[in-house]
């Protein structure tokens, strides 16, 4: 059984596919960067420079191997999201991880977007199978 789940679409952030991992709504690094209007490398650099402030399973999930393969297959079958074929791992950000990034970016845009994500994307209701 895959740990990836599809959720019902967010009414305010329809451009982001509603993704879930281990029952937790998540965003990819690309999605988070797009929302905050920064480059992906800025998200990665903030994470690298503040790694001790992030806890895996609480702020993010780092998936690889079979988990990554299952997640990619599930997402790519339902959405136009594409992942690199040779991507060895993928970081998925939880609501708490997205909040940490908003704090580090410390821009009005980041805080406004986080509030929107908090009220919509991270509050989606699971679809019944």
Regions found by a protein language model. Give the residues of each.
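An anion-engaging/catalytic patch
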Residues: 1-129
């Amino acid at each position: 059984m895959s740990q990836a789940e599809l959720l019902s679409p967010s009414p305010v952030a329809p451009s982001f596919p509603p993704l879930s991992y281990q029952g937790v709504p998540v965003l990819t690094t690309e999605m988070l960067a797009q929302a905050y209007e920064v480059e992906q490398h800025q998200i990665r650099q903030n994470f690298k420079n503040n790694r001790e402030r992030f806890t895996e399973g609480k702020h993010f999930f780092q998936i690889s191997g079979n988990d990554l393969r299952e997640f990619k297959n599930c997402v790519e079958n339902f959405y136009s999201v594409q992942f690199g074929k040779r991507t060895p791992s993928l970081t998925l950000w939880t609501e708490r991880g997205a909040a940490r990034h908003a704090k580090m970016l410390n821009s009005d845009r980041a805080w406004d977007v986080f509030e929107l994500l908090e009220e919509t994307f991270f509050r989606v209701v699971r679809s019944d199978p």
